[in-house]
């Protein structure tokens, strides 16, 4: 029993211990399970986070790969499009090239057809011309046949007439016929000789003028109507004016020159149209400035002194010019007259330098023609001497020059040259003509005389506008400093007969609308051209 109880107790104890052990183990297992669960949860969280990271990485990688693939696809598409476009362009280019070649062939074929058409037209014209020529020749042959028959009848009649003539009458008839034939031949030869002489004369004259102009180089300074005098300082202006202007009034009254004192620093201007009086005033003013004594009495003294000095300078100018031109044995009065031309101007051109140049040109021309060179130079030098005193003596400078040339026993050729160089009388020597030509060369070229460039250009422009104002005028050109207008007309509008009428109309309009020195030559040219090509 006890054993049973012990057994039962032992069993109970074993149960209790087993339960306790089992509880402990269950608790440990639970704790282990919880720990395992926690670990599993942590691992799950870690795995989930890692999975999310991996998923994000995979997503980004996929995006990058997708973007790269898209770019690659885009590049491939662009490359294919480029290749396709190039293929299309190449096809278009080849088609355009073919079209261009086709157009070129068509143009060449058209040109060939045009040329053939022109050739056919020209051949047709040639055939028409030949046909017309044959017709004309046939008519001409018929006319000549009629003339031959008529001549045969006339000769027959003449023979019948001669048969009835005496020997003297027959001789007279033969001489008359011979004279008529010779008269016609002589007239033809005379006309040909005159034409040849005229052509050679014109060419020789041009050559002579060209040689003369090339061998002479003149120097010119444009003359003015004012002279500037430089002062050491502006204080000198007050001394020149003087108290209440008495000094300047004295100088102006004694010299006849306007003394202009303005704001221009250290300059006094002398204005006057008489170069001699202006030069005397300049010399006087410079002497007053150098001397320092400026008052009316001193001014009168210096003016008189400089007048005498001016006479000596005039004589020196005349002697130097006479020596330069090679004109010895000139009368002293003529030397003084020529010296006065140093202070005489004509349209701004110094007359003494002009006279020297005319003398040299006339001498060159005379030498080329075998004339008296010394006489030609002397005549050219003296041709304008009347201008030195034409303001003091009544009459033109030509009349005054003739009178003084006769008075001082100059050569008759010199007298006639002075009288004829402006066309007042007819020249009676070759030298007179040469001096007139030299005078025109020296004075009429552009720039020798003071015609402003603006007026000069305007005159040429007006001359050309007058010519082009007529219907049928193609071009017009003003030549030789406005001394010739050359007009080119349209041949389809202006006939040969109308050319003459046009030249007269242009001449009349120029005379009515322009002011000009000398003469203007109007030349109208009508030119017809025919151009063809040999194939």
UniProtKB/Swiss-Prot annotation:
Catalytic class of the enzyme: hydrolase
Domain KH: 225-285
InterPro entries: HD/PDEase_dom, HD_domain, HDIG_dom, KH_dom, KH_dom_type_1, KH_dom_type_1_sf, Ribonuclease_Y, RNase_Y_N
Record-level GO BP terms: mRNA catabolic process
Gene Ontology cellular-component terms listed: plasma membrane
EC number of this enzyme: 3.1.-.-
Record carries keyword Repressor: no
GO molecular function: RNA binding; RNA endonuclease activity
PROSITE patterns the record matches: HD, KH_TYPE_1
Record region (Disordered): 118-141
SUPFAM superfamilies: Eukaryotic type KH-domain (KH-domain type I), HD-domain/PDEase-like
Keyword terms, alphabetized: Cell membrane, Endonuclease, Hydrolase, Membrane, Nuclease, RNA-binding, Transmembrane, Transmembrane helix
Subcellular location: Cell membrane
Membrane topology: Single-pass membrane protein
One Pfam family recorded for the sequence: RNase_Y_N
Transmembrane parts of this sequence: 4-24
Domain HD: residue ranges: 351-444
Protein family per UniProt: Belongs to the RNase Y family.
Function: Endoribonuclease that initiates mRNA decay.
NCBIfam families given in the database record: HDIG, PRK00106.1, RNase_Y
This protein's name: Ribonuclease Y
Species annotation: Streptococcus pyogenes serotype M1
Gene giving rise to this polypeptide: rny
């Amino acid at each position: 029993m006890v054993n049973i109880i012990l057994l039962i107790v032992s069993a109970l104890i074993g149960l209790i211990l087993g339960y306790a052990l089992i509880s402990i183990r269950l608790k440990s297992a639970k704790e282990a399970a919880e720990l395992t669960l926690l670990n599993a949860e942590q691992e799950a969280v870690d795995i989930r986070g890692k999975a999310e990271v991996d998923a994000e990485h995979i997503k980004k990688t996929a995006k990058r790969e997708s973007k790269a693939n898209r770019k690659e696809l885009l590049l491939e598409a662009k490359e294919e499009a480029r290749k396709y476009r190039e293929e299309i362009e190449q096809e278009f280019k080849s088609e355009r090239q073919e079209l261009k070649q086709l157009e070129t062939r068509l143009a060449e074929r058209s040109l060939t057809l045009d040329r053939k058409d022109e050739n056919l037209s020209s051949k047709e014209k040639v055939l028409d011309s030949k046909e017309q020529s044959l017709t004309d020749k046939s008519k001409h042959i018929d006319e000549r046949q009629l003339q031959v028959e008529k001549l045969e009848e006339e000769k027959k009649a003449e023979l019948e007439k001669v048969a009835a003539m005496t020997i003297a009458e027959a001789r007279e008839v033969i001489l008359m016929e011979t004279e008529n034939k010779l008269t016609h031949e002589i007239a033809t030869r005379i006309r040909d000789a005159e034409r040849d002489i005229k052509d050679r004369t014109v060419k020789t004259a041009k050559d002579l003028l060209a040689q003369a102009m090339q061998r002479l180089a003149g120097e010119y300074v444009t003359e003015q109507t004012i002279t500037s005098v430089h002062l050491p300082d502006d204080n000198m202006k007050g001394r020149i004016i003087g108290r209440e202007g008495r000094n300047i009034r004295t100088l102006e009254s004694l010299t006849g020159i306007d003394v202009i004192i303005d704001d221009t620093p250290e300059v006094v201007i002398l204005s006057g149209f008489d170069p001699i009086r202006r030069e005397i005033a300049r010399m006087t003013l410079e002497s007053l400035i150098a001397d320092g004594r400026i008052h009316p009495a001193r001014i009168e003294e210096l003016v008189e002194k400089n007048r005498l000095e001016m006479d000596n300078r005039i004589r020196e100018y005349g002697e130097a010019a006479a020596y330069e031109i090679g004109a010895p044995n000139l009368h002293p009065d003529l030397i003084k007259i020529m010296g006065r031309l140093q202070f005489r101007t004509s349209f701004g051109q110094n007359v003494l330098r002009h006279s020297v140049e005319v003398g040299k040109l006339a001498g060159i021309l005379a030498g080329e023609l075998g004339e008296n060179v010394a006489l030609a130079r002397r005549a050219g030098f003296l041709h304008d001497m009347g201008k030195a005193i034409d303001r003091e003596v009544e009459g033109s400078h030509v009349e005054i020059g003739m009178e003084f040339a006769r008075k001082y026993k100059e050569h008759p050729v010199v007298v006639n040259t002075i009288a004829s160089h402006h066309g007042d009388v007819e020249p009676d020597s070759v030298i007179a003509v040469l001096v007139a030509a030299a005078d025109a060369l020296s004075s009429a070229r552009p720039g020798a005389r003071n015609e402003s460039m603006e007026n000069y250009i305007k005159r040429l422009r007006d001359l050309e506008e007058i010519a082009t104002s007529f219907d049928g005028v193609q071009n017009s050109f003003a030549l030789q400093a406005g001394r010739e207008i050359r007009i080119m007309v349209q041949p389809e509008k202006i006939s040969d007969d109308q050319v003459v009428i046009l030249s007269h109309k242009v001449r009349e309009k120029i005379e009515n609308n322009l002011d000009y020195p000398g003469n203007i030559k109007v030349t109208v040219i009508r030119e017809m051209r025919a151009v063809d090509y040999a194939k």
